[in-house]
Every structure is written in C-alpha cells, then in structure tokens.
C-alpha cells in the first residue's frame, strides 16, 4: 500500500523590484540609479507587514547585500538570507542576529521549510530574480515602475508585462496585500514619475 505524500508545497515567493518602464533597468554600478524616499518607505512596509504578525524573510544576492549601507543591514524586523555560492559572506557568522548565508536560492528555501516565518520576498539582484522567476512558486511581483529611460547596467531578466502568464492586479488588491493605503497612480519626485503595481502569476 502506497502512503500518500505529505511533503509540504514550496513556499510562495514574492518578488519586489523597482525598474524603468522602457527596458526594466534595475541597477547602475552596484546601486540603484535613483533614490526615491516614498519608494523606500513602501519597500519597508511591504516587506515587513504580515496579516498574522509573523516575521517575513528577505532573500538577496551578495552584491545586493553589500549595496546596503552597513548601518542598515541586516534589514531590521525581517529575517535576512544572503546568497553566496561559497556559502559564506564577510561579516556574517552563525552568531549574526537576523541574517544567515545560503549557497543558493533552493538552499535558502530548504532551510525555510517548516519554519514559523511569514512571507518570503526576493529583493535582488538580477541573477536571483531570474532564478526565482523560473520557479512556479514565485507567484507575485510588487513592481515599482519608474517611468523614465535611464542608464542602467543591470536589467530585470524577464519582461513579465508582456508575458500572458502574468496579470496586473487591482490597486485595492495591492493595498490588501501590503496591509494599508498605497498612493494610487503616478508619484512625481525629483523630476521622476513612478507607480506602485502588483502582478500575479495566473493559476
């Protein structure tokens, strides 16, 4: 007699990314090509809110981690996982609070199986986004569309806006997911226009 499999399904992954509308540029010389204060506040709220007040997880590549000013890392009130093929990152040890190192995205997700953490966010960079997009469990993208044609040297790997597998959700659904009011429509700051959006993979 065959015993039914009780293996838990892979956890849902949410990508959060800001990119240009023209070519989905996301980075320049190891950092963001812009600094938008409301976008930073939105990122913090989106990645910390959980309807059951659980601690969320943010997963990032080593270069993304190093682009965060040391005084702001690990990102507070979230469990940080930094990916490094070597399995180690300078300044992070087993005793480091709120942060750990995994050798790959799949390794990170294996570590999270059965944990009490909340939502899992993929926050960059390009290679990590690409690997996550290939996983069926990656089913949501919080996309900040920066409506400008700016110089970048790193682009988002897949234009999901033109992929029939993905659909843009309503603004009300975005607000429900992030747990509060979100500015609707374009925000203009420092001559840049940008908009908060949520996309989901079709079932």
PLM segments and residue spans:
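Enzymes that bind and transform nitrogen-containing heteroaromatic metabolites
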Residues: 2-203
């Amino acid at each position: 007699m065959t015993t039914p499999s009780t293996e838990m399904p892979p956890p849902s992954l949410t990508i959060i990314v800001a990119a240009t509308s023209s070519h989905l540029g996301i980075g320049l010389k190891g950092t963001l090509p812009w600094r938008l204060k409301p976008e930073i506040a939105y990122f913090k709220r989106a990645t910390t809110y959980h309807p059951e007040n659980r601690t969320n997880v943010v997963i990032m590549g080593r270069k993304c981690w190093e682009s965060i000013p040391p005084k702001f890392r690990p990102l507070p009130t979230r469990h940080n996982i930094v990916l490094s093929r070597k399995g180690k990152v300078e300044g992070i040890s087993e005793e480091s609070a709120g942060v750990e190192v995994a050798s790959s995205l799949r390794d990170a997700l294996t570590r999270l199986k059965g944990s009490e953490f909340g939502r899992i966010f993929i926050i960059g960079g390009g290679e990590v986004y690409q690997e996550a997009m290939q996983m069926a469990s990656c089913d949501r993208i919080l996309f900040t569309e920066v409506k400008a044609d700016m110089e970048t040297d790193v682009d988002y790997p897949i234009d999901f806006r033109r992929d029939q597998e993905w659909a843009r959700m309503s603004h009300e659904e975005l607000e429900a997911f992030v747990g509060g009011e979100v500015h609707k429509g374009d925000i203009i700051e420092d001559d840049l226009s940008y908009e908060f959006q949520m996309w989901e993979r079709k079932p």
